[in-house]
Amino acid sequence: MATPAGLERWVQDELHSVLGLSERHVAQFLIGTAQRCASAEEFVQRLRDTDTLDLSGPARDFALKLWNKVPRKAVAEKPARAAEREARALLEKNRSYRLLEDSEESSEEAVGRAGSSLQKKRKKRKHLRKKRQEEEEEEEEEEVPEKGKKTTGGNKPQTEKPESEDEWERTERERLQDLEERDAFAERVRQRDKDRTRNVLERSDKKAYEEAQKRLKMAEEDRKAMVPELRKKSRREYLAKREREKLEDLEAELADEEFLFGDVELSRHERRELKYKRRVRDLAREYRAAGEQEKLEATNRYHMPEETRGQPTRAVDLVEEESGAPGEEQRRWEEARLGAASLKFGARDAASQEPKYQLVLEEEETIEFVRATQLQGDEEPAAPPAPTQAQQKESIQAVRRSLPVFPFREELLAAVANHQILIIEGETGSGKTTQIPQYLFEEGYTQKGMKIACTQPRRVAAMSVAARVAREMGVKLGNEVGYSIRFEDCTSERTVLRYMTDGMLLREFLSEPDLASYSVVMVDEAHERTLHTDILFGLIKDVARFRPELKVLVASATLDTARFSTFFDDAPVFRIPGRRFPVDIFYTKAPEADYLEACVVSVLQIHVTQPPGDILVFLTGQEEIEAACEMLQDRCRRLGSKIRELLVLPIYANLPSDMQARIFQPTPPGARKVVVATNIAETSLTIEGIIYVLDPGFCKQKSYNPRTGMESLTVTPCSKASANQRAGRAGRVAAGKCFRLYTAWAYQHELEETTVPEIQRTSLGNVVLLLKSLGIHDLMHFDFLDPPPYETLLLALEQLYALGALNHLGELTTSGRKMAELPVDPMLSKMILASEKYSCSEEILTVAAMLSVNNSIFYRPKDKVVHADNARVNFFLPGGDHLVLLNVYTQWAESGYSSQWCYENFVQFRSMRRARDVREQLEGLLERVEVGLSSCQGDYIRVRKAITAGYFYHTARLTRSGYRTVKQQQTVFIHPNSSLFEEQPRWLLYHELVLTTKEFMRQVLEIESSWLLEVAPHYYKAKELEDPHAKKMPKKTGKTREELG
């Protein structure tokens, strides 16, 4: 039999001839597998299960030869096994003896002797088996020498296992143990959710019962207290009424007596009686006259004036009027004095009336548009409606009946009943988002505790649509109708219509993989093709096959409906005709160099020259929107009363809800509203009264480079589909106009047909983690509508493996299952889980919450730049930006979460309040992932190590040419707003790498290279972290010329 070393060389040689390649670890794996197999067929079957070898022909012959060559301990029978075999034979023999007939005494004695001897042999066999198992375990732990030798004797190992087998078995045992822990954790989470749901209902019922009891008690007490007062009031009213009635009766009685007995002589008693009645009547009249005189005098007294003011005809901007800018009062006084000095009256001012708009319509500023095409509408308007029609709407039910989807209500419900999956095509504003869920609710799809889910790609859309539907149904938002977005849940156990972002529905699959509590799932705005929408398509398609009673509706705005139908196994398409008026499209004669300035000029140009109607402007992001609004307000302020009032209203995702709602308010008479929005207004929102649309032709898109791991949010030209959607916003209520700030040639030749799906241009770490949590392991063959690049998918798997979320077989680990429960980036999840090890979870929660508010903590007013920068520097702490964020939140919490503190320190209160909400939700999820709360008590080294445990992938070190990432060797730069911008530490960790003017590192943290080996020894090697410039030359004593010879 060959030695282990010789056998390994033989396997390597054979692998060359069979596979064309050879590797030492593969040879050791094959030898170890052959040693564990009891037969050659079992060995062949195990190799076939790996799906790496084609076991036909030479490969099968090689496997059989290898199994015959591999030494096995079962060849020579050990003495212990022989003794066990003899004892088993004796036991069988004794059993056969028991069946013979014999006297009871002799039989009992024989059985007793046999039993006693059998017990001794059993003890001996038990001892031998235990000893043999210990010897085998010792044999497996020993290493294989270069030249193995056979040993004699049953107590010595015959062969020694190779090192790779021991490592493989240990890894396999750890993998199986981790899988058991993961499944146990998932079961605990599921049971905890179940218990919590039941407790919520019980608490709700108990609370409702207590509230009703309290209400009844208060009603009884109020009734007892009110009855005496009501009696007094009723008595007084009755007395006044009785007085009037008695006086009327007395006057009637006197009139009758005068008419009947006026000419008759009366007795003395009758005359006295008549005189008494007249006296009583006169006194009553005098009393009434005195009361009326007192009331008349009371009306002549001074009374405090009552509130009689109505709605102002001109909108008042409180922020503008209460402006506290330096010198504001002096500026107003000077303007008033100058205005009084140059005041003119009458016809002398007529000559200056003609060029009153010269600041807007100067020739060098005016943008010339050319009418190119017209989008035909379905209806011809009789006349342009006045803006006041928005204030004179019908009731909510009348508005519902006026929507284009209403005439097709019965047909739509019949199509939903007859088909499991239905594609709905309809224009934005046709009512499919708000009305179809209500139709399904009225039809009874929410009976027996079932719910209807409607997904939206954006948070703002989910919140605004839910509020609108709640008003139409006459219920409070959060009861029957609610919404669920990231870090905010406005639902209850009574919610049956649930609007949510598509990412939140994906997270529902974790706790309810079959969506058993939903009867209908509606994926709205499917044409936007967001990352989560594409993942939802694959999952819902699979769930629909498993649950035939589940209804799936895919709503799209006239784009890609045929492709959606093909993807869902040729599902039928239900088309809702849109109510759209003609739209004239205008292009510029020449390209515009600065589209932001062109937008501002065009808005004023439309405002001055065009008939009444609101304006919708599309810009790329919050910064551009705020800049455009500021420019418009400044120019309108300079023009003053020369132009009509122009209301400038922004709309973007981070805007507070109350300010978002302003765009839906009716425009005051005599004014014009301009809404400056991102592409959220393309399809997700419908704003009434829009007649004019300004389209610069740009949008912001996130792109991801898997080779460098860098994300960039760049301004890119929009697609033709998006441009047509924007133009369609102008034809909602009347014939409109769309002004495109680019040429017709650019539209035809420079714009893409459709937008690239987000799944093909973003990082997939969260998606891979979620799909793995749902038990989907074969990601390469997952049913994507548009598959992502394999390079991006492989990088996501590599990152999750480095973070410990996946094992070497690509299976989800216990840590990965916990990371999937946290609705944040995988690196941020790893940082939160690692905080338990370093006892700093309180601080890490704060850092994670502050990192989740999109770098919008500080603000710099243009007139107070120096003060804002000084306030920011006051928060700096040694160590990096993460500790600065922690310091800001800590001081804000110590101030009692004060908004005044934020104003004084140039911190955005809205962002801090959102960070507090995020922290509270993450703190609630810590119990779910079984992480305890702890604080480091100011030991920031532990905080920095916990952050390093999650973001060791994002590290850079200082070289002679600047900062370079450790792995990719990419040149990067510290962002100028960082607290470490001037310090330049040798080793850095960054939160994200963004491409703007340069490759900037945002939110950097100073670390030590030894921490990387501590938290990620599997990812970094000591040689990679050595600094070649820090090495010193060895000290050596020089020699003289004589010594050198």
UniProtKB/Swiss-Prot annotation:
ATP binds at residues 426-433. CDD domains: DEXHc_DHX16 (cd17974), SF2_C_RHA (cd18791). Its EC number is 3.6.4.13. Residues 413-577 form the Helicase ATP-binding domain. The modification Phosphothreonine is found at residue 716. GO terms for cellular component: cytoplasm; nucleoplasm; nucleus; U2-type precatalytic spliceosome. Residues 119-131 have a biased composition (Basic residues). It catalyses: ATP + H2O = ADP + phosphate + H(+). Residues 170-211 have a biased composition (Basic and acidic residues). Component of pre-catalytic spliceosome complexes. Component of the minor spliceosome, which splices U12-type introns. Interacts with GPKOW. Interacts with TRIM6. Interacts with RIGI. Required for pre-mRNA splicing as a component of the spliceosome. Contributes to pre-mRNA splicing after spliceosome formation and prior to the first transesterification reaction. As a component of the minor spliceosome, involved in the splicing of U12-type introns in pre-mRNAs. Also plays a role in innate antiviral response by acting as a pattern recognition receptor sensing splicing signals in viral RNA. This is Pre-mRNA-splicing factor ATP-dependent RNA helicase DHX16. The lineage of its organism: Eukaryota, Metazoa, Chordata, Craniata, Vertebrata. The gene is DHX16.
